[in-house]
Swiss-Prot record:
Keyword Ubl conjugation (UniProt): yes
Annotated protein name in UniProt: U11/U12 small nuclear ribonucleoprotein 35 kDa protein
Gene Ontology molecular function: mRNA binding; snRNA binding
Domain of life: Eukaryota
Source organism of the structure: Bos taurus
Length: 245
């Protein structure tokens, strides 16, 4: 596939539900729900989406001050928002950090992913809600990433990029039959040749007895031909598999 990309450039719920982005039918109800959903980004969110990072898998006890301390190492922060439950005020375990310049954003994106903060290994990605066309959040069956235990894995993002599809060669039936017919004809030709040689050998054997038996088995010519053909087929098959990888 010449247009294959590990990271989605546009959000498609059906493709996101497939490990290689090739599914043609939804495999669970959440994918169906995401395909039917219509989502409009929150207009109350401010700041430049192209300078904003999404930070997830935070310890629920991690505070804004700690995040600012860690992420200010990469550049000047314009805005930091730790998302909290509206009722309880408890952290939901993710935040958005807006930098003042792109250089700081890229440095944090590259170096902060996988950092351990308050005994939790964090995940860092670009903000997608306002930057990825067609975005559907996880609560509507979409999103990206996730864990196997959740039963809602989504592919095409930094956490779980698409795997490259495996393109198996298609053999047409008529080509298969033609090749099979040719192999049968070659096999019959070798068998006729072999029968003729065996009859000659049997006749000569009546006139002369072996004085001693050879220590090792001598392969008749027909067997050598079969063995050579077998090896050639194995080599061709291995080369074909190597080219298809």
């Amino acid at each position: 596939m010449n247009d294959w990309m590990p990271i989605a450039k546009e959000y498609d719920p059906l493709k996101a539900g497939s490990i290689d982005g090739t599914d043609e039918d939804p495999h669970d109800r959440a994918v169906w729900r995401a395909m039917l959903a219509r989502y409009t980004p929150n207009k109350g969110v401010t700041g430049d989406p192209l300078l904003t990072l999404f930070v997830a898998r935070l310890n629920l006890q991690t505070k804004e001050e700690k995040l600012k301390e860690v992420f200010s190492r990469y550049g000047d922060i314009r805005r930091l928002r730790l998302v909290r439950d509206l009722v309880t005020g408890f952290s939901k375990g993710y935040a958005f950090i807006e930098y003042k310049d792109e250089r700081s954003l890229l440095k944090a994106y590259r170096d902060a992913d996988g950092l351990v903060i308050d005994q939790h290994e964090i995940f860092v990605d670009y903000e997608l809600e306002r930057t990825l066309k067609g975005w559907i959040p996880r609560r509507l069956g979409g999103g990206l990433g996730g864990k196997k235990e959740s039963g809602q894995l989504r592919f095409g993002g930094r956490d779980r990029p698409f795997r490259k599809p495996i393109n198996l060669p298609v053999v047409k039936n008529d080509q298969f039959r033609e090749g099979k017919r040719e192999r049968r004809e070659r096999s019959r030709s070798r068998e006729r040749h072999w029968d003729s040689r065996m009859r000659d050998h049997h006749d000569r054997g009546r006139e002369k007895r072996w004085q001693e038996r050879e220590p090792a088995r001598a392969w008749p010519e027909g067997d050598w031909e079969r063995e050579r053909d077998f090896r050639d087929d194995r080599v061709k098959g291995r080369e074909k598999r190597d080219r298809s990888k």
